[in-house]
Design a protein with these regions (language model features):
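Conserved catalytic-core helix/loop/strand module for nucleotide-ribose chemistry
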Residues: 1-168
Length: 168
């Protein structure tokens, strides 16, 4: 309670909170687009069942080429009606939200509640977060970037490798 009262609890929002607003979950998103490629659906399903979503995204990106960026933007860049428990976030957490989501659901929830974020940072600028919070700013940290640009995006295996390395 004490930590929460100080505003030191920061929610980490994943894709599940956007599904109720009509955005696809990762499995649905990836499976939806293999029909547009020559990827073997059974092999692709095996990759997904193994939980290797970054590898599945990489295969899809390789198969679609430049169209992959458009596919991501079309799936997650459209404004949809906000629904579900994500709407409670602005009423529970006031200073910062960290998300891996590409969509704008969290940002729009805070705007609708009259608590817009002072600033939105992509993951590549996450080191600035402590300073921004110390300045009293309400920050949305989009760790994996946004749907509107591949710059700073972390979705495919190559993008994970570029931003996070091999994990050692």
């Amino acid at each position: 309670k004490e930590v929460y009262a100080r505003g030191a609890v920061v929610p980490f929002v994943g894709a599940g909170l956007s599904v109720s607003s009509g955005y696809p979950g990762w499995t649905a998103f990836l499976k939806q687009h293999i029909r547009e490629t020559a990827i073997d659906p059974e092999e692709f399903d095996q990759i997904l069942r193994a939980g290797e979503y970054e590898e599945a995204a990489q295969r899809l990106a390789d198969a679609l080429g430049a169209a992959f960026n458009e596919v991501v933007e079309n799936a997650f860049g459209r404004s949809r009606e906000i629904s579900g428990c994500v709407q409670l976030l602005p009423h529970v957490f006031d200073s910062c939200v960290i998300t891996t989501n590409f969509d704008g659901v969290t940002k729009r929830c805070y705007e609708a509640a009259g608590k817009p974020f002072s600033e939105e940072l992509s993951g590549e600028y996450s080191r600035d977060l402590p300073r921004k919070l110390a300045e009293g700013k309400r920050i949305l940290l989009k760790l994996h970037g946004t749907s509107t640009t591949p710059r700073g995006r972390i979705l495919t295996a190559a993008e994970y490798q570029k931003h996070y390395g091999d994990g050692n």
